[in-house]
């Protein structure tokens, strides 16, 4: 398939132009005009670039891209990364906030579905846009039972043992913790822990799961990969390169 067609599909499906973002969302580096195989990863890095080349991908789609608000200087690490992509004829496509907020394949929608809750209200306002979701489980469920569905997490167990109202804001989502407390959320799920969240959660009487920044944001690219396979009929592969952060 032609690169322009793949990019057009992704731009439209993810509504790339609907977000004011620090990330330059969309096609960041142009490579091969023909796309036979697409790799998906959380982060743009030399490790993910090399892994994409190793599986003979023509395009790499990531959540955390290479270009954030423009490139000031093409030297050092930036120079080596761009040089590798161009020499490998490997296209790089990034979707940051669009892949957090998407109701079908977004990180937060997928997190909620994994625990048995359908995303309902938009939640977690960031730069004027809500990028997460809140939801209600069908019945009050033990916090430990929910944790088993998501895998290892750092837990602040400051709320009720059984919860029904939940919310998710992946990645560095502690900015929405106050919003969660004010909204009566009983379990708030995010990625990266922040020191200030401890006493805020304790005083707010809320349970908090910290899945890790990486782990909370691999769901979106994995779900988008399945859509690309189904809708475009292109071979696709997920490159799991955890940061343990």
From Swiss-Prot:
GO MF terms held by the record: metal ion binding
Pfam families: DUF34_NIF3
Binding, a divalent metal cation 2: 64, 213, 217
GO annotations of cellular component type: cytoplasm
InterPro entries assigned: DUF34/NIF3 (IPR002678), DUF34/NIF3_sf (IPR036069)
Keyword Metal-binding: yes
Gene3D superfamilies named in the record: NIF3 (NGG1p interacting factor 3)-like
Binding residues annotated for a divalent metal cation 1, in chain numbering: 63, 100, 217
Keywords annotated in UniProt: Metal-binding
Entry similarity comment: Belongs to the GTP cyclohydrolase I type 2/NIF3 family.
Subunit structure comment from the entry: Homohexamer.
This protein's name: GTP cyclohydrolase 1 type 2 homolog
């Amino acid at each position: 398939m032609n690169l322009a067609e793949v990019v057009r599909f992704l731009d439209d499906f993810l509504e790339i132009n609907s977000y004011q973002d620090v990330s330059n969302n969309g096609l960041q580096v142009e490579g091969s005009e023909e796309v036979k195989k697409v790799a998906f990863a959380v982060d743009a890095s030399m490790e993910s670039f090399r892994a994409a080349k190793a599986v003979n991908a023509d395009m790499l789609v990531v959540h955390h891209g290479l270009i954030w608000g423009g490139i000031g200087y093409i030297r050092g690490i930036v120079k080596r990364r761009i040089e590798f992509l161009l020499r490998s004829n490997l296209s790089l496509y990034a979707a940051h906030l669009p892949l957090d907020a998407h109701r079908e394949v977004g990180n937060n929608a997928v997190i909620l579905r994994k625990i048995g809750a359908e995303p309902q209200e938009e939640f977690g306002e960031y730069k004027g846009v809500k990028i997460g979701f809140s939801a209600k489980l069908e019945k009050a469920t033990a916090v430990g039972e929910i944790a088993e569905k998501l895998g290892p997490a750092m837990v602040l167990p400051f709320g009720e043992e059984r919860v029904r109202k939940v919310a998710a804001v992946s990645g560095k989502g502690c900015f929405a913790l106050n919003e969660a407390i004010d909204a009566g959320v009983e379990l708030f799920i995010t990625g990266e822990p922040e020191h200030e969240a401890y006493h805020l959660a304790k005083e707010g009487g809320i349970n908090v799961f910290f899945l890790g920044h990486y782990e909370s944001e691999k769901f979106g690219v994995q779900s988008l990969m399945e859509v690309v396979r189904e809708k475009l009929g292109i071979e696709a592969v997920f490159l799991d390169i955890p940061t343990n952060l």
